[in-house]
């Protein structure tokens, strides 16, 4: 069975892209895959028609392992296998057509995922151990093995990142950096670490990745520059682009004839903070009580049923939680000084400590909207309220903590 080192996985999705049976699903928060239930697949046990079987396969070197085989002609689509699948990766294909293979999500041990992983964090039990990335993060801003793609540069809300040249390492101005962690979440190669922690990656969708064969001159610059080796040269003096990759864009940026076009949509940043109001996603039930009690709408919650708090508007979104982390990005671009980052005294574990809060003077605000544009989490907004024309910033009142019944919020 395959084994994935989820901790060091960069969530590029290449394994998902090459898996012929849909047995891997890569998400920002997790990697879900068929692990054959540790050697005793429950789907095989549950199948009443012997459509799923556990059979021997001989790997390179004569090593014998097990794989799952599937006989579509025996399958009656009863769904018993789907019900018992522990990771929830098995699914019946219901596309309205007579599908040739109506079941997806079982591992056939083809090893394509192992071969394609650019950092070798996918292995096979007893054959090849998944690689472990050993790094010592000893600085608040830590950069290692940066490929110089520059993807993080335009995402920085305070313009603290510069890239001298594509292919060279980025530089981060420690005086400007507000430790929001967006660069680390955006980095497709796990080269940036902020505040000593590994980030949860932002979602990344490749909307367009194409090659203009008429413009391609077969120079192989893209082949040589691709950090993961995803691009392959072809005999007709063009190249073959992958369906899924980290989408760093180095190939597009360094192509001398502009023959490559790449369009990537990044998902929203995740609030990151270890001081002030801290959110524990494991305890959160997305009930929205915190958002309803926040006096300044500095929290936005989407419930499992698609209701947004505050406001109760119905939206077509998955459950999510967004909170102002008092990162201070808004204060750095405010031209009038209406928004300021100030320190207040708070009690934390019996000790009095200084913590940041956002201070706002409406009389100085000219409603320019710079703060809204720069907010890393999209929580700030302009309002029609003359008394409070900007909302969404945390004043550290702690009412959200008092409202939460599940200990998902606390002050540190």
Swiss-Prot record:
Cofactor(s) listed: [4Fe-4S] cluster
Keyword Iron: yes
Residue numbers binding [4Fe-4S] cluster: 9, 12, 15, 19, 75, 78, 81, 85, 107, 110, 113, 117, 146, 149, 152, 156, 177, 180, 183, 187, 216, 219, 222, 226, 245, 248, 251, 255, 284, 287, 290, 294, 324, 327, 330, 334, 365, 368, 371, 375
Record text on cofactor binding: Binds 10 [4Fe-4S] clusters.
Gene Ontology terms for molecular function: 4 iron, 4 sulfur cluster binding; electron transfer activity; iron ion binding; oxidoreductase activity
Domain of life: Archaea
Signal peptide (from-to): none
Keywords for this protein: 4Fe-4S, Iron, Iron-sulfur, Metal-binding, Repeat
Chain ranges of the 4Fe-4S ferredoxin-type domain: 2-29, 30-57, 66-95, 96-127, 138-166, 168-197, 207-236, 237-265, 275-304, 311-344, 356-385, 386-412
Xref: Pfam families: Fer4, Fer4_4, Fer4_7
SUPFAM superfamilies: 4Fe-4S ferredoxins
PANTHER family referenced in this protein's UniProt entry, alphabetically: ADENYLYLSULFATE REDUCTASE, BETA SUBUNIT, FERREDOXIN III
Designated name of the protein: Polyferredoxin protein MvhB
Phylogenetic classification of the source organism: Archaea, Methanobacteriati, Methanobacteriota, Methanomada group, Methanobacteria
């Amino acid at each position: 069975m395959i084994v994935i080192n989820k901790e060091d996985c960069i969530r590029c999705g290449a394994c998902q892209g090459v898996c012929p049976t849909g047995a891997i699903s890569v998400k920002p928060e997790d990697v879900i895959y068929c692990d054959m239930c540790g050697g005793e697949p429950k789907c095989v046990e549950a199948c009443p028609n012997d459509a799923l079987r556990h059979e021997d396969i001989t790997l390179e070197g004569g090593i014998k392992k097990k794989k799952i085989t599937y006989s579509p002609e025996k399958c009656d689509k009863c769904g018993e296998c789907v019900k018992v699948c522990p990771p929830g990766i098995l699914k019946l294909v219901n596309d309205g057509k007579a599908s040739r293979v109506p079941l997806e999500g079982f591992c056939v041990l083809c090893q394509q995922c192992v071969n394609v992983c650019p950092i070798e964090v996918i292995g096979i039990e007893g054959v090849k151990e998944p690689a472990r990335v050993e790094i010592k993060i000893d600085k608040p801003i830590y950069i290692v093995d940066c490929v110089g793609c520059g993807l993080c540069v335009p995402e920085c809300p305070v313009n603290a990142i510069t890239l001298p040249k594509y292919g060279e390492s980025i530089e981060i101005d420690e005086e400007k950096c507000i430790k929001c962690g967006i660069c680390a979440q955006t980095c497709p190669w796990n080269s940036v670490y902020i505040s000593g922690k590994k980030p949860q990656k932002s979602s990344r969708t490749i909307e367009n990745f194409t090659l203009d064969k008429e413009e391609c001159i077969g120079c192989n610059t893209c082949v040589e520059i691709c950090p993961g080796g995803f691009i392959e040269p072809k005999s007709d003096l063009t190249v073959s682009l992958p369906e899924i990759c980290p989408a760093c864009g180095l190939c597009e940026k360094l192509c001398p004839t502009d023959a490559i076009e790449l369009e990537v949509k990044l998902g929203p940043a995740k609030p990151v903070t270890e001081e002030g109001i801290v959110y524990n996603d494991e305890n959160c039930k997305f009930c929205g009580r915190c958002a309803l009690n926040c006096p300044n709408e500095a929290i936005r919650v989407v419930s499992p049923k698609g209701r947004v708090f505050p406001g109760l508007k119905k939206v077509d979104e998955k459950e999510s939680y967004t909170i102002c982390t008092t990162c201070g990005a808004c204060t750095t671009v405010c031209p009038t000084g209406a928004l300021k980052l100030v320190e207040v005294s708070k009690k934390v574990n019996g000790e009095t400590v200084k913590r940041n809060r956002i201070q706002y003077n409406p009389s100085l605000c000219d409603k320019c909207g710079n703060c809204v544009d720069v907010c890393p989490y999209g929580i700030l907004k302009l309002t029609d309220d003359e008394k409070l024309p900007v909302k969404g910033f945390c004043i550290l009142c702690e009412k959200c903590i008092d409202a939460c019944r599940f200990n998902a919020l606390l002050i540190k």
